[in-house]
A protein has these predicted regions:
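Conserved catalytic core of the tyrosine transesterase superfamily
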Residues: 1-323
Length: 323
């Protein structure tokens, strides 16, 4: 990728190092958009020595051809850069206003038992040739990584950034330190998942004894988003036809839990609160979204909760993003 070349290049590079160190950096979109912004500044303000309000405002203005989400992706890294500079007293520029998220209708794939069986059997059948470290590591990691998503409902990012020290092997507790909105929380693993995690740890330890991340990539780093996407895509479409993405395993986890409550003499408020906390939602409103994708759940909730129905399932927007 082309390097930064302008007078503000050292500041941009410092910003990138900071975000990478805190594990909050998207290499696939953030860096390219910062490079395009720098190129825009060089072309339209030749010889500039510092960032100005006009430069930032002109770049961040929403274009006629842009949807809100497209604009958010394009200007987000620049807004983050300006915020970084302001927090350190390096600029007096005001942060541009980021367009609000547009309401969208997203219907996640409803996994069938056969599809999931096909998928996990294929995960378990990965080959070991050529017999080298990357291939052996993938053979061990992929089945456990995706089963962890399936059994715990954690985000793909949370699983990727999970450190070895974040996994309590004795009690089966995950310390989710890097989450959406930096909302640290803890996950209790099912006994069967804990057993699988322990076996994986023993096996991967023989290959990567000094690893930092629980699911290690090369150079003692964590796997990138593209690793999740490619592995899920290649395995899924090798045995299934319906469209699906890895993030939908999280939706599946929520729906399966909610469906299990039907017929149980339990308090839905308590169950929703527990599910909300375990999934790392900052507010219960985010969890209430799932009622809209479970067929018939609204009627079930009305029958179970009566007056509490409006509190449980008001109309809210989904604040989750697919990874």
């Amino acid at each position: 990728m082309r390097s930064f070349q302008s007078s503000i290049a050292p500041l941009i590079q410092s910003f990138i190092r900071y975000r990478k160190a805190s594990d909050h950096w998207n290499e696939s979109s953030s860096e390219p958009n910062l490079l395009i912004f720098e190129r825009y500044c060089l072309m339209n303000y030749p010889g500039f020595t510092e960032l100005t309000q006009k430069m930032v405002d002109n770049w961040c203005r929403q274009r006629d051809t842009e949807l809100n989400e497209s604009c958010r992706v394009r200007i987000g890294p620049v807004v983050g850069f300006v915020r970084y500079l302001k927090e350190r007293g390096l600029t007096s520029i005001y942060e541009p206003v980021i367009p609000k998220k547009e309401p969208r209708i997203y219907i996640p794939h409803a996994f069938t038992e056969q599809e999931l069986t096909n998928f996990f059997c294929e995960c378990d059948s990965l080959g070991v040739h050529p017999r080298n470290e990357p291939v052996l590591t993938r053979k061990l990691t992929v089945p456990v990584f995706f089963r962890l998503l399936y059994s715990s409902g954690i985000r793909t990012t949370e699983a990727r950034l999970l450190r070895k020290t974040d996994v309590d092997m004795e009690h089966g507790i995950l310390n989710i330190r890097y989450s959406k909105g930096r909302n640290q929380h803890y996950i209790a693993l099912h006994d069967s998942m804990l057993e699988l995690i322990r076996k994986y740890d023993i096996a991967i330890e023989k290959i990567r004894p000094d690893r930092t991340y629980f699911f290690p990539a090369r150079n003692d780093s964590f796997h990138k988003r593209s690793w999740v996407q490619k592995n899920f895509h290649d395995i899924w479409y090798g045995v299934n036809k319906a469209h699906a993405v890895a993030y939908e395993l999280r939706h599946h986890y929520a729906v399966k839990n909610i469906n299990r409550w039907a017929g149980l003499g339990v308090t839905f408020n308590d169950k929703l609160l527990y599910l909300s906390k375990s999934m790392g939602h900052t507010t219960i409103e985010s969890t209430k979204y799932y009622y809209s994708i479970v067929p018939g759940l609204s009627q079930i909730l009305r029958e179970k909760t009566e007056t509490g129905f409006d509190w449980i399932v008001p109309e809210v927007e989904d604040d989750e993003s697919n990874e």
